[in-house]
Amino acid sequence: MHGLLLAAAGLLSLPLHVIAHPQPSTNLAGRGVDLDAYRMADRSSYMNSDDMKLKQPGIASLSGGNYVDTATEVVKRMMPGMTFRMVDDHYVGESGISHVYFRQTMHGMDIDNSDFNVNIGKDGKVLSFGHSFYTGPAPDKAPVEKRDFSDPMKAFHGACKALSLPINADKATVQTMNEHEVMFMGTSGAMSDPQGKLCYMAKEDGTLALTWRVETDMGDNWLLSYVDAKETEKVHNVVDYVSHATYQVYRRALSPDPTEGKRESIENPWNLKTSPFTWISDGKTNYTTTRGNNAIAQANFDGGEDYLNNHRPNNKNLKFEYPYAPNMSPKSYIDASVTQLFYSANMVHDLYYMLGFTEKAGNFQVNNHGQGGKGNDFVILNAQDGSGTNNANFATPPDGKPGRMRVYIWTKAKPARDSSFEAGTVIHEYTHGLSNRLTGGPANAGCLNGMESGGMGEGWGDFFATAIRLKPNDNRNANYVHGEWVNNSPKGNRMYPYSTSLQTNPLVYTSCNKYNEVHAIGTVWGSMLYEVLWNLIDKHGKNDGPTPVFENGVPKDGKYLAMKLVMDGMAIQPCKPTFVQARDAIIDADMNLTKGSNRCEIWKAFAKRGLGVGAKYDPKNRTGNKGLPKDCQ
């Protein structure tokens, strides 16, 4: 393959900025429906490795044989008499942890929000597990036997009416896909044919509801609406897969924005260990445009769905070098914008791959070249997307379906600014894909839709963006603001800068009691992870290079070690985790990776901001605590 020359602005050094959604909103794109009112409760439990040894020694001592069999035995022992199925997405992660996922069933149908995940450590023993299984009364008969449910078309119309979805279904028909699953054919207004699935849903009041799960991809929202199967005007809950917020490019470790770097031409910037086909091939076809195995980038001025036929830069000599200056009008530099977005997303793909987000973990690639997982799911990157302004978002469907990033023009400055050039936006959005695929397993992309779990989704995006943004001379006194360039404001779009100073950033766990919005809650979580980051850097040093250096599978420096442990924690934690459970998962990740050598540094970071050993979750009245385990005092 010919060499590739990109004019790039630098990804991993871009100071990150952004948080998707500068103006926090969960309204259904332009239709005034508040999706927060339909969020599922965070109802999972998690037994960490320490508690399991004390409370479930029989489970903790299980080992030997096939890790799938061991995990299945855990579920049988913990949930005797209950029925369940294993989800076909189990895998052994790069840190040696085996992740196995189960879905509870009732009368042969899924309870769609009842999950069980088991983590087997690299020593072959059960590391931890989490679950949200339903333990209330069971219906005496299968609804299919009684035919005690509505026609799926009524449920589809019920979802459209309740959520004001602009879908025309006057001539729609129902096509049966398999038992309990249908497709609604002949509609218009959605980006693909809507689908329906008959399933149970565990309600907050401890009862079960029989529902039609109606899936509608509306572009800025990709919804799973749980419509009551009898009273089809009632929608119980809604999951949204969309998280709102030689190339001549800005290069410096992903330069944060055009004020912190200069554009330069970079030849063949890919890593063949993480992108063996390069960035401009999928192993079958070699491209001369911004398309490859990991991503496809293009302009999307009208905000539509037909990305394949949209404009993208093309050069038979693979020289993607185009003019750009912040004082130019956005459309005049669209080729530079698409090139920068393509570069940044691919750089993130390669870095996250090194840290463990591989094919079997559910990453985004067309061709998985026999490494596990489901392919055909690169990231669709829409530059200067016309469906909105002053924002960006990322849609994360289950493994095997493409992710979709929409990057908008920001109108807070004149001329307007293109967030393709702010790497923080791209990293933040791509990290939504990471956290949604890892939490609960690659086949379950709806595990971060609760208020606290959704907030952590925003916080992880900020954390990775900030960690990547760190400069060589930074120390723990460095403060970082998100979104200052696109927002045209030194305050950015967060309540406080990320800082280890409680005077500069006073957020603690109980601050979440005041907030009922995911970006605010996410800033609390991101602030805690920033403390973890600097505690580990102070202990292990900081690698300022664009990629980690490993020793026996462990990053040698504190920055990349923190990123690795946080990423491993995502895969360990249960579906719809709380702060407490996610904290425990990170500590368990360190136990597996380093035998717990960083346990106290991690505990001290969380305890500083009120998530110590006595912290307790209650959605309306969280209890903060700064206590440490005895061995860390």
UniProtKB/Swiss-Prot annotation:
Zn(2+) binds at H428, H432. Its EC number is 3.4.24.-. The keyword Nuclease does not apply. One of its GO terms (cellular component) is extracellular region. It is found in: Secreted. It is an enzyme of class 3 (hydrolase). Glycans are attached at N286, N592, N621. CDD domains: M36 (cd09596). Its main location: secreted. The keyword DNA repair does not apply. Its cofactor is Zn(2+). The active site is at E429. Secreted metalloproteinase probably acting as a virulence factor. Belongs to the peptidase M36 family. This is Extracellular metalloproteinase 5. It comes from Arthroderma benhamiae.
